[in-house]
Amino acid sequence: MSKYIAITFSPVQSFIEKSRKLRDLYGASQILSDLTSTIVTHRPEQYHLISPGLLNSQQGMPNRVLLKIDSEMQSSSSEEIIAELQRAFLNRWKNILATCRKWVENALAPYYRSSEWNWQKSWKKWEKRTWEFFWGMGDNLESAMVDLENRKLARNWQGVNWVGESSSLSGTDAIAWYGMDRENQDMKTLDWSEENRHIALFYRRLAFLLDGVNDPDGQPKDRQPEGKYIDGNERLNIPELTKRLITLPHIARSLGVELPEELRQRGFRDLIRRPQDNPASVGQKTGWFMGDGDKVGDYLKDLGSDQKIRDFSKIMRQWGQKFQRDFNQTELGRIIYAGGDDFLGIVYNSQFPGPQLNSIDLDRVLHWLQTPHK
């Protein structure tokens, strides 16, 4: 007898809401799409993939997967196949983390002895505690999706504890730096000013290297990094640092991660958002828009046949690609993610900075978004 399986996953830490740069947003989207791609391309001979469609493109891969396992395909039990897919998912995330960590260690090797790197333990914790993986199973698609939703109610997650200062972006989780796992430290006697000095130097060096400056310590003290990837005054936790680094072409290539076409052609034009708590700071006002399919789950159930669902998934992904490409050509902003039944975009002034160019042309944005796009 055939079994239907529904799979999804979600970040425990929000990958989107605290982002100040386009690089954060693109990095988060790339990671989500890549992890879904890992699930649906692992041992495909064990199941029939129903959704998502359009596997030749990694961009905009939704994090909801529908599978069908026929009885003649079941050399392993359905539960064993699910466990194997989950292991592949987690191993891919471990590989992403390890690649980013090793790149930083190699880049900063001239400045720190190997014995000074005390941060591997924290990276190991984030291997297991970043994502929640959910699945449901049933004799038909509807029962599998209901089972998935029921299982999502029983969450089993543990946070990562930390001491010291936290991320300057989210305000949560430890700052990633080479000494974050130092042992035998007394919190009462620790010289916090000295630690902050080490952290500041670590991020200054890393920011300059990511900007392409080969001699960070040779730069004048009053010179600040350009901040293509990291601003010199930013302090990131491990997931946030990973989001930035996965957009580095060398790391993306080594992982086989597909960067969006417009970024390969035009590069990043990073957008600095003005923090809400400091309206006088550098940056510009931005607007956000998002869309979510109205009762798409119910629509999928009504479609009935597996082939109709496959066709619908493919059409939705094709629509998302065209929607993203068309909006990005308007120079009103960027579509960060468009796949499946949802999308996220940002609007801003593409001419910023400039005299009297701080406003967003909301009339044009609304007119474009309200125009039907097929």
Residue ranges and their predicted role:
Residues M1-K374:
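Regulatory and interdomain segments flanking nucleotide-handling catalytic cores
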